[in-house]
Amino acid sequence: MPKNISFVVGIVIWGGICIGNWKRKIRLSVDFLFVSFTVFIGYVFVCSLFTSQYIHSVYIVSGWILFVLMRNGKNSTETFNSILAAVGVLSALYGLLQYTGYIETQSYFSVTGSFDNPAGFAASIVLCYPFLLCQTSNGKRKTLKFMACLLLIIVVILSGSRTGILTLCVVTLLFYALRYRKLIHRRRIFFISGGALFLIGLFIGLIYLKPASASGRVLIWKVSAGLCKEHIIQGNGLGSFKADYMPEQAKYLSSSYADESDRILAGNTNHPFNEYLLLLIEQGLIGIALFLLSLIAVFRSNVVFDTPALLTLVSIAIFSCFSYPFKYAFVWFMIIYCLASLNQREVALR
């Protein structure tokens, strides 16, 4: 069964169990985050009704139902966080066995985990990493935690995912900067400057690691920018990028703006390798505004910034700049779980 379909089936089963266990009075967690996220999802859902692929509507509704169930569930957050940390370790071990040849891959790439390419695999590892990093430990457990974190980092490097490597470094620096902010407060300018220089150097180095790939993405972004012009307010519609990109690319390559290197790099593209750009193209400025409203709600949730939920949301935000994480059901699950974990206010419904 495909993972996306399994995602929907799992939510239906979980929802049925929860409805069966609910008492006469239902407590619904309603706050600014709930309202803003619901409005954003509602807008995307309405847009999905005007497409021929109605399965998108099913995915969107399933995601919102999962958000409601998790917001109102009484499951232990610490236990679930530990499970996600274990999932990250097991996935990393699986990828390591693929790299060493003990498990064969059905792909051109040497490390893909249970995904179709390294991008999805690296994203799953990176999103589990904060839950392992934030685990409390001492003595021998501290050593095991360090080795497990190192395993995840090594496997992401072996996968060749440049976005994954960059995200791991950002999350690690952010975690320790927040955890030990009192110690580095006096020399914060030194540490901030050093961290910024390190990340800038890493970013430039990762670009030169695969220069053709980086140039190809820049070309995709330039062509994609042309898709925003016609319907900038409401967007071109859900799923429109796949249909509109290739004609727009042909138009760009035949113009005076394109050079020979652009014509060499051009190819068949189904995603702009930037989720924010995709949102602007398909949902327009309205979608961007509703997304920013949800982002404001996250920062107003009074949650500590060195928690795994916030660090995972940061990871998704970085991945969304250079890849296509929302292609995978696991990423949808993680962002919904993290949003549902933030502070909430209950309202009793009779």
Q: How would you label these PLM feature ranges?
A:
Residues 238-281:
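Interfacial juxtamembrane loops and adjacent helix segments
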Residues 110-114, 171-172, 198-232, 243, ...:
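Flexible juxtamembrane loops connecting transmembrane helices in multi-pass membrane enzymes
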Residues 221, 234, 269-277, 311-314:
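Alpha-helical membrane-protein architecture signal
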Residues 1-5, 23-26:
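Short, hydrophobic transmembrane alpha-helix segments
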Residues 10-18, 38-46, 57-107, 113-182, ...:
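Alpha-helical transmembrane segments of multi-pass inner-membrane proteins
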Residues 49-55, 157-159, 209-210, 321-327:
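Membrane-interface helix caps and helix-loop-helix hairpins in membrane proteins
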Residues 346-350:
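Short, charged juxtamembrane terminal tails flanking transmembrane helices
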Residues 117, 217, 235, 328:
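Short, conserved phosphate/pyrophosphate- and ester-handling motifs at nucleotide-, phospho-/glycolipid
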